[in-house]
């Protein structure tokens, strides 16, 4: 990235969106993006401008930004009306990477609640420890992972395979904004030194990470253009192979793609190099992080 430093500084100096100044953040003076969104709700609302452009591609399913926004509103209504989820409450997500994982993440933060991304590789007993500690209003899960906890779980659970959001008629009337330094999600450590711990991640943190990635991407694009490489011919498409319960899959992947208006190709199943290469070629993938 060192070769792009001058392009990064030029963008900071010339583009209001990337302007940086100092602010007091919880008692500490820090460099921040001056004109940043103040809530992940802004990401959701801004996504409407991308209309019918694909946001998520998963197996043979394509979900546009418009469709995603509608599904998020439906999921948020379910959380509010059926499970009394309020700002600060927790919603646990225990599933493999899939569109529903992403939809319920956005639905959760859109009403000021906290998404708890449980490690999808955990055994049932490990998941139960995290669930009991977080005490969510509801768990959303795929069938495979619910089966691991079915005989122990005490919390209400929504199973993705039993839930067809497209058939649900009611939608959230209005999103709920909370302070940018409030928690948006809990992601868990690996547990190499003991029991995995939930790490609080704020709206501010996720917004800053996404904005920084967009800045770096713009700088790399300008650097490439100066060497005769034109990326503008390809539709921005990212390949998501990292788990959504990890910051690389969620914040760097799905969240940034929504903000940037890029298409996210959600990989499913065990990582197979040949399969990945074919997907990259088929969908003309322009970015892949891990």
Task: Name what the model sees in each region.
Residues 32-36, 41, 52-86, 92-106, ...:
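Conserved AMP-binding/adenylate-forming core of the ANL superfamily
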């Amino acid at each position: 990235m060192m070769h792009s430093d001058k392009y990064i500084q030029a963008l900071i100096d010339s583009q209001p969106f990337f302007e940086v100044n100092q602010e007091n953040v919880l008692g500490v003076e820090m460099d921040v993006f001056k004109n940043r969104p103040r809530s992940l709700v802004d990401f959701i609302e801004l996504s409407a401008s991308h209309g019918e452009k694909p946001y998520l591609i998963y197996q043979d399913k394509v979900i546009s930004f418009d469709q995603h926004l509608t599904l998020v509103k439906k999921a948020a209504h379910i959380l509010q009306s059926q499970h009394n989820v309020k700002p600060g409450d927790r919603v646990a997500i225990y599933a493999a990477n899939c569109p529903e994982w992403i939809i319920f993440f956005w639905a959760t933060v859109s009403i000021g609640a906290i998404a708890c991304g449980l490690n999808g590789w955990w055994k049932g007993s490990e998941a139960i420890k995290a669930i009991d500690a977080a005490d969510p209003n509801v768990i959303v899960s795929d069938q495979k992972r619910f089966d691991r906890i079915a005989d122990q779980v005490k919390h209400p659970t929504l199973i993705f395979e039993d839930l067809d959001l497209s058939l649900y008629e009611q939608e959230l009337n209005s999103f709920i904004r909370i302070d940018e330094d409030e928690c948006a999600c809990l992601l868990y450590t690996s547990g190499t030194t003991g029991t995995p711990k939930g790490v609080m991640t704020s709206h501010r943190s996720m917004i800053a990470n996404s904005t920084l990635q967009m800045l770096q991407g713009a700088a790399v694009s300008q650097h490439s253009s100066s060497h005769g490489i034109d990326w503008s011919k390809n539709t921005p498409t990212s390949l998501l192979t990292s788990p959504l319960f990890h910051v690389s899959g969620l914040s760097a992947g799905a969240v940034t793609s929504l903000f940037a208006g890029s298409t996210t190709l959600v990989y499913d199943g065990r990582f197979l190099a040949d399969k990945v290469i074919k997907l990259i070629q088929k969908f003309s993938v322009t970015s892949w992080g891990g």
